[in-house]
Regions:
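Short, structured active-site "lid" loops
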Residues: 12-23, 280-288
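Glycine-rich beta-strand-to-loop/alpha-helix junction loops that act as flexible
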Residues: 23-31, 108, 183, 310-313
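Conserved N-terminal alpha-helical segment that immediately precedes and caps sugar-phosphate-binding
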Residues: 11-12, 32, 57-60, 147, ...
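Short alpha-helical segments enriched in small residues
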Residues: 187-370
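Proline/glycine-rich low-complexity loops and linkers
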Residues: 12, 33-129
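Short, small-residue-biased leader/transition segments that mark boundaries at the very start
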Residues: 1-13
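Flexible gly/pro-rich beta->alpha loop and the following alpha-helix that scaffold active-site loops
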Residues: 23-46, 201, 205-212
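Accessory alpha-helical/coil subdomains and C-terminal extensions
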Residues: 98-174, 179-181, 189-194
């Protein structure tokens, strides 16, 4: 945001200490976007207008029927010493500088723009540049066990990992991923040692493993539903449609997903899901009895083969001594058969919503696999 703050610690490109430096952000059209100016100063390079970038910017605004300002045109001003990396998702191009056998890369700060350029442009170029080194990665996705408990279970296995393999624990809301990375000269050998370690890992935590690499729970459930030629609906309370959002984010979900009943209030639980008021009064809306009825009646209302129901206390209000913040009940019904489980999450509303949806998909997967 300020030129002095964005300047490199050293003042000459020959002083760079790292082989690769990647910067994100500050490439936009506003006055606080000064990364481009800092790089021009650092590499002692004039700013010049790049015809391809200007064309991309003009087409970007034309497609959206938006007027083009001088500030927008200035997006095409780039340091003359930079190799331009086209941004097909926005207006700020990426920039690649070669200096004294070092590489400096500047990418837009908008996450999806940065991610796409990194994945489809930067990583392939870096692999080509450093083709002598092979990197093999495999990710094991787990559910239902925390990072520290997982680490305890795997202590001996981790201690005896092949010396060329590095392990990383990558926790997210309700999920922990184990990433194994091997580096060396022989890709076939690296694949073999990674696969051997996963074969040792599987019996230790098999009940927690649900997928690998880029698998998603919603994707696995989708494949199982399509395989069975069966349909799904959801009945949501505390998640407010977030589970439906995850399911419908997949293209083709209309082939198996019928829709969602978002019964946030008790009145709608009674009206739309036919939950007797006596059940809600007697047990509370966050209860085994109510969530199971939500799932069973959701199947009936939507005429679907399966229904996943969620009811909980996302917070920050609504908790009691009996039902503290983060209490969530989830049920999965298949016709008249239903299973349910109680979860105790934390005190952060959004995290509780995300973890509820993840846990619900995990339960659905288990039912579909039976």
């Amino acid at each position: 945001d300020h030129l002095d703050l964005h300047s490199f610690p050293t003042r000459r490109s020959s002083d760079l200490n790292h082989d690769i430096v990647i910067l994100t952000g500050g490439l936009g059209p506003t006055n606080d976007d000064v990364t481009k100016l800092s790089l021009a100063e650092f590499f002692e390079s004039d700013l010049v207008s790049d015809p391809q970038v200007l064309k991309d910017v003009e087409e970007f605004f034309l497609k959206r029927n938006l007027g083009l300002t001088e500030k927008n045109r200035n997006q095409a001003l780039v340091p003359a010493k930079a190799k331009i990396i086209r941004n097909r998702y926005g207006t700020a191009p990426g920039m690649w500088f070669d200096a004294n056998e070092k590489i400096v890369i500047a990418l837009p700060g908008v996450p999806f723009e940065m991610k796409n350029i990194l994945e489809f442009e930067i990583i392939p170029r870096l692999k080509n540049r450093f083709s002598g080194t092979c990197v093999v990665q495999k990710t094991v996705n787990t559910l239902g066990i925390g990072e520290s408990f997982l680490s305890d279970k795997l202590a001996d296995w981790e201690t005896n990992l092949h010396p060329q393999i590095r392990l990383a624990y990558l926790p997210a809301a309700g999920i922990v991923k184990l990433r194994l990375t091997a580096k060396g000269q022989n890709e076939e050998f690296l694949n073999s040692i990674v696969e051997a370690e996963i074969q040792k890992l599987d019996p230790l935590i098999s009940k927690y493993i649900w997928g690998f690499d880029n698998d998603t729970l919603e994707g696995i459930c989708a494949a199982l539903l399509l395989q069975k030629k069966q349909t799904l609906t959801t009945a949501e309370s505390c998640t407010g449609g977030y589970l439906a959002h995850k399911i419908t984010a997949l293209p083709g979900s209309s082939q198996y997903y019928k829709g969602s009943i978002i019964a946030y209030s008790n009145a709608l639980k009674t009206k739309l899901l036919n939950i007797p008021e006596s059940e809600i009064t007697g047990y509370g809306s966050v209860s085994k009895q109510v969530v199971e009825l939500m799932a069973i009646n959701g199947c009936k209302a939507m005429q679907s083969d399966y229904c996943v129901a969620i009811s909980g206390i996302a917070g920050p209000g609504g908790a009691s001594i009996e039902k503290p913040l983060g209490t969530v009940w989830i049920a999965v019904a298949h016709k008249e058969n239903v299973i349910s489980a109680k979860f105790q999450f934390g005190d952060q509303r959004h995290t509780n919503i995300v973890r509820s949806a993840v846990a619900a998909l995990g339960m659905l997967r288990e039912v579909l696999l039976k």
